[in-house]
A protein has these predicted regions:
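Cytosolic nucleotide-binding catalytic cores of signal-transduction proteins
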Residues: 2-83
Length: 83
């Protein structure tokens, strides 16, 4: 499921993962997956289903990702749209 999604995502956003890894070399594969889902506009409950997590876990992962990316006041969605 992820492999198919990733293949389709890369067709639409060919440099997304490369740019994200350049901006944050320590980003994990799981965080990249979360970023891709967020970039497509998925809501937390849908992301939770895709990742087999609870929606609260997705919120925590998003918070940790914001910290890792040092976003300050910029929203994660806006940041990812700009990549």
């Amino acid at each position: 499921e992820w492999d198919f999604f990733k293949m389709q995502f890369v067709k639409v956003h060919p440099d997304f993962f490369v740019r994200l890894k350049t901006l944050c070399p320590s980003i994990t594969e799981g965080e990249l997956r979360l970023c891709a889902y967020i970039r497509t506009g998925m809501e937390n409950k849908h992301i939770a289903q895709m990742l087999s997590l609870q929606p609260e876990s997705v919120k925590k992962n998003r918070y940790r990702l914001r910290q890792k990316l040092n976003l300050g006041k910029e929203s994660l969605e806006d940041f990812l749209r700009g990549i």
